[in-house]
Amino acid sequence: MEQAQAFATCAGRLQALATRQGAVHDPQSSETRQKQYGFEDLLDALLPHVSDAGIDARAAKRWRAYGWTEIAGLLSRAQYHEDDRHARSARADMARRIDTCTRMIL
């Protein structure tokens, strides 16, 4: 169930980004949160099929946590890394990952 994994990972990524945006009062946080909810809805629709395929439903929580941790780490590197090159690289990597998710639902 590659789709379920992608949807869960993207939900986690967007949740981390929306959390950060909300913390700094970024006006895009609401839009990001709506995208997160969209991925959660897609994942919820697939979960019965994931279970039927013999995949533990808890896997979706792990996939979501992986996506959240991935973006949280990149956000940390982007903001706090002493080397500007590493910070730019983290921002670019994060943008690519978020863009990958956004393109799935547009």
Q: Model features per residue range: what roles?
A:
Residues 2-51:
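Short N-proximal segments of mature Sec-exported proteins
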Residues 40-106:
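Compact alpha-helical subdomains of small soluble proteins
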Residues 1-2, 57:
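Generic hydrophobic-segment detector
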